Every structure is written in C-alpha cells, then in structure tokens.
C-alpha cells in the first residue's frame, strides 16, 4: 500500500490466497472479484458450464456473501466475469452479450476485453496489437450494456471512441 495501490484485482476471487482478504479489510481498498474456472494452468482445458451466465452469477453470489461476511464493505466490491479465464468463444460471447444480468447483484461491473483471444477467434488477427478494432467494438457494446469499468491497453483510443459514441447517442 506504500506504493500507492488503489485497487486489488484478484483473478481467483479470493480463493488462491487467504491473506488477500486481510489486506483488503486492513487498508479498506476496492477490489475486483474475478471469475475463473479452474486455475491459470488448467482454465482453458475444455471449460464447461451448465449455463455460463447463471453459473457465474451463482459464483458471484457465493463470493459476495463470503467477502461481506468477512467484513469487506459493500462499496469496495467490483465484479468481473473473467472473459477468457476458463471460457471458450461461445462462453465469452454469451457473457459479453448478456453482461447486464450482473448489474442485479448491485456492484460495479468491470470487464477486461482488450486484445482478448475471442477477438482473435472472430477476426483471425493473430497479433494482439492488431485487435484494436475488436477491442473498441466490444468496449462500446459493453458500455451499452451498462458496464462501468473497462480494462484496456489502448486507453486513449478507447476513451476517444466512447466520447464519440456517447455524443452520437445524444442526437
């Protein structure tokens, strides 16, 4: 915290390290409950869900109960469905297209879609630096769904696209 950390993004949803919750409570800082199926080393080995939306929704309900019971303040919680973390193309597209479901949980929604593999799978652009168009398109769609926080690489380009998009919506 001496380094000026303003937010913790725990890709495990506080499952891999039981010390994280203590730090979050001690310093009273916002953190992201991130969804992942499995562990980083196994997450992409044939990911399966009964219903990707409802399974992840239920995961958030469970994790939110845990962190609230542990004493974390409501306004310090952000949720991230974890695009690309234990999900195939169909899962990712379903999550992005229906992400507004997660607003009913009552927390800000963060989505990290910048340069992701699903953009590669659709656009056939292998070089991650060639996925800006897909990142911008996905970001604008997420904004339309009410997503409050975007995690992106090309910050200026995404901000510009959002400004133009919002201005056009006014007319």
Regions found by a protein language model. Give the residues of each.
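Active-site metal-binding loops of divalent metal-dependent hydrolases
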Residues: 83
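Conserved C-terminal portion of the radical SAM core fold
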Residues: 68-70
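Short acidic capping loops at alpha-helix termini that bridge into adjacent secondary structure
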Residues: 73-76
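Active-site-adjacent loop and "lid" segments of alpha/beta metabolic enzymes
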Residues: 1-66, 86-171
């Amino acid at each position: 915290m001496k380094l000026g950390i303003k937010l913790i993004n725990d890709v495990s949803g506080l499952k891999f390290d039981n010390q994280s919750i203590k730090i979050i409570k001690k310093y009273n800082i916002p953190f992201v409950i991130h969804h992942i199926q499995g562990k980083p080393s196994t997450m992409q080995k044939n990911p399966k869900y009964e219903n990707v939306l409802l399974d992840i929704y239920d995961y958030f309900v469970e994790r939110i109960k845990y962190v609230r019971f542990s004493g974390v303040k409501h306004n310090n919680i952000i949720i991230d469905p974890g695009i690309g973390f234990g999900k195939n193309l169909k899962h990712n597209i379903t999550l992005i297209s229906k992400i507004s479901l997660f607003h009913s949980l009552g927390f800000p929604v963060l989505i990290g879609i910048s340069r992701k593999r699903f953009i590669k799978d659709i656009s056939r652009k292998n070089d991650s630096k060639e996925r800006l168009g897909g990142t911008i398109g996905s970001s604008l769609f997420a904004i339309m769904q009410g997503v409050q926080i975007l995690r992106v690489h090309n910050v200026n380009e995404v901000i510009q696209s959002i400004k133009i998009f919002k201005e056009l919506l006014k007319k």
